[in-house]
Amino acid sequence: MKRFSFLIMLLFSTVVLAQKVVDKALIKTQTEIVFPENPGGSAAAPGGGDGERGMNFGGMSGLDLTSTIYFKGDMTKIESTSDFGNNITITDRKNRKTTTLMEMMGKKMGFYSTDEDEKTMKARQDSIRAKRTDSLQKMGINVAPPAAPEIIYTEETKKIAGYNCKKAIIKTKNRQGEVSETTIWYNPEFKMAEGFSMNAGGGMGRAMMGGGLNGMDQINGFPMEYDVQRSNGMKVHMVVTKIQLDATIDDKIFEIPKGYDIKPMSEMGGPGGGGRVFRMGGEN
């Protein structure tokens, strides 16, 4: 029995060691987003966790995004193109700074944020959420803390961008007790190094690689495709169309382009000056 257990542990260790850690990559993705008919739905409740509060989509039903992701060491850059406009997010993990650039309706603008800005904004949001939860509990409405995500690995496989991928399901439950499932197709052969930022840019930038999905960072591999539906009706489908590992990427790729009016995140609109409110059409 001990010999059998040792062999199992040895086999598991071999699999873990065989998983490649990638510190340079060029990734192309296609993301389809279907906006909710009612942006102020159940996701707006305290702890909904869907992150779509306060969004104004200007009557648009959806958005298709074509993105190119450059990753090298501590730097991640996401270039996204859609009918709405162009978007660039550059994340510098070494200096703990993220710059988001937008080109829409002939205007070039952007904002930058630091890790401290993110912590301050999160603390403010947590405080607002706690006050709302307290108000509901005083009304006799129980709001439970969000449960840890449950990841179910399956043996289903399919090929994506030339790679054999496996299927996993992430089950999450929000504070209202609503259960949602996200289907992930991942490649178990490699993961990105620690410097890779799945949260680049927040909002739509986050949606590219699922950085906003609870449990995504726990997947034992690299996400190649996912489908998610929020409790307010918002849907996101992302698929990797091309991936080049150990790509040759010039450092100039990560330089901030000229011609943009860039401000600190604290001066941008949205709750707490966070620059996170994503408005599609209409006035700010």
Task: Give the label of every model feature segment.
Residues 1-22, 278:
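Bacterial Sec-dependent N-terminal signal peptides
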Residues 20-284:
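Extended soluble regions of mature proteins
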